[in-house]
Amino acid sequence: GGFHICPPGWNCELSNRNHFRAWGMEAKGWMIVETGSAAGLDGSIAKAAERGENWFGYYWSPTAIIGKYNMQAVDMGEYAGKDNWDNCLSKPEQECANPLKSSWVKSEVYSVATDNFKQTAGKEGMSYLEKRTYPGPVMNGMLVWMGENQAEGADAAIEFLKTQEDVWTKWVSKSAAKKIKKAL
């Protein structure tokens, strides 16, 4: 098989190469597939999907291509720790003698607000920010919709409110949800 890795010069190229070694993929008959660029990586996914072929490699989310082709993450087990990640997996191969098998670092996204916003938003506004979360498949799907419709953010917001009621109504009060639905 082939493991499609990040384009040259991207930080994820380093961790891709070290994951390849940690999992002993070469000894199992795998090879690294270098796509050369972000467009090349995207093209490799599209080509495989259009041919009905499997594709294995690194990609991030949320993105339209993940949503368009309904790609699934491979379970790579437990995260092997910050030391393994920072001092080995994320380094050039010559600086990472013994990479350990590891899942990826989990990226967390936070909403932040100024004191002024907190005061003017009130309890209901802050409650909304605390509850708001976009499930990955929903975000990927919205990015696909935006690309296919050449839509701007404002258009996507309306589409989201119309099609993802089960998601956003959990973020707001019943009275706010009723007003939003009426406005749509």
PLM features per residue range, with description:
Residues 21-25, 46-50, 130-134, 147, ...:
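Sec-exported extracytoplasmic/periplasmic mature domains
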Residues 4, 10, 86, 92-94:
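Extracellular secreted precursors and ectodomains with disulfide-bonded cysteine-rich loops/domains
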Residues 106-121, 142-145:
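A bilobed periplasmic-binding-protein/Venus flytrap-type ligand-binding module shared by bacterial periplasmic
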Residues 48-85:
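A ligand-binding cleft/hinge motif common to bilobed small-molecule-binding domains
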Residues 8-12, 37-40, 61-66, 80, ...:
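Solvent-exposed loop/turn segments at secondary-structure junctions
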Residues 140-184:
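N-terminal hydrophobic or amphipathic helices and topogenic motifs
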Residues 1-27, 31-44, 51, 136, ...:
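Bilobed "Venus flytrap"/periplasmic-binding protein-like clamshell domains
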Residues 120-132:
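Short amphipathic alpha-helical coupling segments at ligand-binding clamshell hinges
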